[in-house]
């Protein structure tokens, strides 16, 4: 049953496939190259209540209907982007920043948090104006709605730009694992006849979905692993003192990870020492040493943290990845830890994140409550 739920979450309304009508069997990808053809359509593959595949074809080839397998049967529409660009690594200070991390495929939690903090309305429209929202990694895996979560962020990203706002999607270790084909949901099994129903080989659907040929896969590859907004550096795992010895800038970190994102350097290091480090156990995707002693290293000391702050010229570092009981600070307020256990239902008051408003930091939740850190 769990495998079926995961399968349905992967396939229910998000396998958007652009294909030329009448030319062979479409594959599990979203591509934009068909726009040069006069006869083209957007196909979406779904799984119904009987776990059978079916295909829907839309004449609006650039719009995808996303359905959510939750009790409310939520759905929304996403327009595919004309092009994908790589995000910058640094941004000037802005008056309003909201951050949340480690949603892990939990659509209800993300929905509640964004609604209650006026990032979007109930029709999934961006209403945060020129504010910035940071999604600090690990928005996939564990939960059963990873793809719906990704499509929602994808949608909000392009709407934010139109109002002068910005969505920052920072990669976490689970995004990398999925891109490498090693995510939590990679072993989903489905019957042979279900493959045949759609006439598509779904044997590696999870890997294909995050491949460089799919829309979401291409989109994730434009994302950074670390960004700085004003005085705040946002990174999913953390920053090890050892990173200073490589003397990398933010662009160097992001480009190196992006160039090596397909390779499991965590387990199989290669010649590029910087890439090995960045994608390895003490890199920004995986490092836990800002919060705790771990089996591979000790917890970062106060003096080591100060060196990290000085090197990156960043008084504040915001992280997820390592679980804490509540949004909290460390190192005399220089570190903000935001990986909490979010609620599974809508608006339970347990889904929490960070608000930075005119330089003042608040803990916020999915009921609209706020309190100073």
Predicted regions located by residue number:
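Feature recognizes metal-dependent phosphohydrolase scaffolds
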Residues: 2-373
């Amino acid at each position: 049953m769990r495998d079926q739920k995961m399968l349905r979450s992967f396939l229910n309304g998000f396998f958007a496939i652009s294909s030329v009508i009448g030319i062979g069997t479409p594959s599990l990808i979203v591509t934009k190259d068909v726009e040069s053809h006069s006869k083209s359509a957007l196909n979406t593959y779904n799984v119904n209540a009987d776990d059978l595949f079916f295909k829907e074809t839309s004449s609006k080839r650039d719009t995808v209907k996303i359905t959510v397998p939750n009790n409310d049967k939520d759905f929304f529409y996403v327009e595919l982007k004309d092009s994908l660009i790589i995000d910058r690594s640094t941004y000037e200070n802005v008056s309003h920043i909201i951050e949340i991390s480690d949603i892990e495929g939990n659509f209800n939690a993300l929905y509640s948090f964004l609604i209650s903090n006026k990032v979007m309305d109930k029709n999934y429209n961006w209403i945060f104006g020129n504010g910035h929202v940071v999604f600090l990694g690990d928005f996939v895996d564990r939960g059963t709605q990873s793809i719906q979560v990704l499509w929602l962020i994808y949608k909000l990203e392009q709407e934010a730009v139109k109002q002068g706002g910005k969505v920052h999607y920072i990669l976490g270790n689970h995004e990398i694992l999925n891109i490498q084909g090693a995510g939590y949901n990679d072993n989903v099994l489905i019957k042979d006849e279900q493959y045949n129903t759609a006439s598509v080989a779904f044997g590696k659907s999870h890997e294909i979905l995050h491949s460089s040929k799919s829309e979401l896969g291409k989109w994730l590859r434009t994302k950074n692993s670390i960004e700085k907004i004003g005085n705040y550096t946002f990174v999913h795992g953390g920053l090890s003192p050892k990173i200073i010895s490589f003397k990398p800038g933010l662009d160097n970190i992001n480009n190196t990870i992006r160039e090596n994102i397909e390779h499991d350097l965590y387990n199989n290091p290669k010649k590029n020492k910087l890439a090995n480090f960045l994608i390895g156990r003490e890199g920004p995707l995986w490092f836990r040493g800002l919060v705790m002693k771990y089996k591979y290293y000790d917890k970062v000391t106060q003096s080591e943290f100060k060196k990290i702050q000085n090197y990156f010229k960043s008084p504040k570092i915001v992280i997820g990845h390592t679980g804490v009981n509540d949004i909290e600070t460390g190192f005399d307020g220089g570190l903000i830890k935001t990986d909490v256990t979010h609620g599974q239902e809508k608006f339970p008051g347990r889904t929490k994140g960070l608000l930075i408003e005119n330089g003042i930091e608040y803990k916020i939740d999915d009921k609209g409550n706020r309190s100073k850190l």
